[in-house]
A protein has these predicted regions:
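Contiguous, structured surface segment used for ligand recognition
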Residues: 9-93, 448, 463-497
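Sec-dependent N-terminal signal peptides
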Residues: 2-9
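Generic recognition of stable, solvent-exposed alpha-helical segments in well-folded globular domains
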Residues: 109-112, 184-191, 252-259, 306-314, ...
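Hydrophobic alpha-helical scaffolding
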Residues: 60, 182, 236, 246-254, ...
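Feature activates predominantly on carbohydrate-active enzymes
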Residues: 21, 41-273, 314, 318, ...
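Active-site neighborhood of glycoside hydrolase catalytic domains
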Residues: 218-222, 234-344, 349-372
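Flexible, acidic glycine-rich loops studded with aromatic residues
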Residues: 326-331, 336-511
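Flexible loop/turn segments at secondary-structure boundaries
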Residues: 6, 104-106, 132-138, 210-216, ...
Length: 511
């Protein structure tokens, strides 16, 4: 039984795995530290008495997390609750994806994200740097990627609908509105890496290929498949541009991709894992492209879908030669041919009947692990912050479509991403992430970013750190009432625990 049932009154989030409230408080602020090699990685032991706080830690991360818990034990009057806690993570991967490709976040905002990750004992910042709608990775070798890919026009058809209301209010005639240029510098990246390292957070950079490449192709149109009709040197804002594929049959395109990865590794020194994307690539473009068909004939590839596997293996081998392991979305292992030892997989499409009916690859995480792959769970049904908090969320309007559905705090907390795992798969499940996608947003600033992420990110943090079994949402909800006040006192925009229209909103007052 985890500590939430012992320490509910202390409102610790994420809940410690073991602990007991011993009663009373102390004003003694003395803290002593000692290393304890018997504790699990990232673990700590905390004892608060009248003599102050005693902290034993396994490593630097454990020492940091002990201080985080100690801070949460403090009352507004400065006194600290007496308690004994032993704590360590259930999973080594506790991540948060930030999509800066669609909507840019300056480095100062990323520092804020990293601070909030420490507060919730999260340790992987997944930095989604390239997209159809924007290129944010600096590059000296391919300057047009920044010159043309870092800005876009709001000019696609149908933009006078409700989704564009707030942008029109802010900038007037959006048909003349240019977003950007926005791109990080090498110095920005170095600062983010240093800030993350000091907080024991891994930074995972992502260059998403071969799909989601409109910004790439806008810079270098000849590297896209033939006959797609893309306008040269222009990026616009349109969701789901699945025909924006890099031409896998073009040797120059493939070499340019590898060159970008090389430059990325220079900017992320010491990185041992790089995200290569691989999701939502539209095979229709390749099937119609003479160069791609020629590649298939040359390599003996019978199925156009297997063309992506050929490309994926080439990228993986290139990174492996430099001592870097690849990680990618679920589609990269849809077909056989990618060795499990070479890659980590993020199966992101939740296996519901609608997705299966479309013929999309949507396995359960355990099904991918059963094939021998290391897995990070990434459910679009329970962990995507692009979806609204509730069906009638006025602040996060969405088109009336079956594809758009609310993801409540309770949905996220009750998600058992390790369900179906067998003892033989032990060690292959690395953890899970929350995903701040911004493709379903017309306008986006840091308030929007935080409002969409909280309080749901708190649920991801707890299920990845504590992985309580069984889940007790009532207990989590009770602790979150206090924790939400903490976050708001820090200036973090948060949606209500029980938004209007949710099942709980009718029976309780939302903080």
């Amino acid at each position: 039984m985890i500590a939430a049932y012992f320490l509910a009154a202390l409102a610790l989030v994420p809940a410690p795995r073991k602990g007991v409230e011993t009663g009373g408080t102390t004003t003694n602020a003395a803290v002593t530290f000692r290393f304890d090699g018997s504790l699990p990685k990232e673990g700590y032991r905390l004892k608060v008495t009248d003599a102050g706080a005693e902290i034993a830690y396994a490593d630097g991360a454990g020492k940091l997390y002990a201080r985080v818990t100690l801070d949460q034990l403090k009352n507004p009057d400065g006194a600290t609750a007496k308690a004994e806690i032993e704590d360590y993570p259930a999973y080594p991967w506790r991540g948060w994806l930030i999509d800066v490709g669609r909507h840019f976040l300056p480095k100062e905002n990323i520092f804020d994200v990293l601070d909030l990750m420490v507060l919730h004992k999260m340790n992987v910042l997944h930095w989604h740097l390239t997209e159809d709608e924007g290129w944010r990775l600096p590059t000296a070798r391919h300057p047009d990627l920044v010159r043309y890919g870092s800005q876009r026009r709001y000019d696609e058809p149908g933009m006078d609908g409700g989704r564009w209301r707030r942008v029109r209010e802010w900038v007037g005639d959006t048909r003349r509105y240019t977003y950007g240029p926005h791109c990080y510098s090498r110095e920005d990246i170095a600062e983010v890496l240093a800030y993350a390292k000091a907080r024991h957070i891994r930074v995972l950079p992502e260059f998403d290929v071969p799909g989601h490449s409109r910004a790439f192709i806008a810079a270098y149109p000849h590297l896209g498949c033939e006959g797609l009709g893309f306008e040269t040197n222009r990026v616009c804002r349109a969701k789901g541009m699945k025909s924006a594929q890099i031409c896998i049959g073009n040797d120059e395109a493939v070499q340019t991709v590898l060159s970008v990865f090389d430059e990325m590794l220079e900017m992320f020194p010491g990185v041992d894992l790089v995200h290569i994307g691989g999701d939502e690539a539209d095979t229709k473009a390749w099937a119609q492209c003479p160069k791609c068909r020629a590649r298939m004939k040359k390599e003996g590839i019978a199925d156009v879908r297997a063309l992506q596997t050929w490309f994926t293996r080439k990228v993986i081998a290139h990174l492996a030669a430099k001592g870097v392991r690849a990680i990618g979305w679920g589609e990269i292992v849809q077909d056989p041919g990618v060795d499990p030892k070479d890659v980590v997989v993020m199966p992101w499409l939740h296996p519901d009947p609608g997705q299966k009916a479309l013929g999309r690859y949507c396995p359960y995480p355990w099904e991918v692990a059963e094939r021998g792959y290391d897995v990070v769970a990434a459910s679009h049904r329970f962990e995507y912050w692009g979806w609204p908090h509730c069906r009638d969320d006025e602040y996060q309007p969405h088109p009336k479509s079956a594809y758009y559905f609310p993801v409540s705090l309770e949905d996220t907390y009750l998600y058992e991403f390790d369900r179906g795992w067998k003892p033989s798969m032990k060690g292959r499940i690395l953890g899970t992430e929350g995903y701040s996608w911004s493709d379903n947003r017309t306008a986006w600033n840091f308030f929007d970013f935080m409002y969409s992420a909280f309080p749901r990110t708190c649920a991801v943090a707890e299920i990845a750190w504590s992985n309580p079994k069984p889940r007790c949402y009532a207990d989590f909800h009770k602790r979150m009432q206090t924790h939400l006040k903490r976050l708001r006192a820090m200036g973090v925009p948060c949606a209500p625990l029980d938004p209007p229209g949710s099942a709980r909103a009718d029976s309780r007052q939302s903080p």
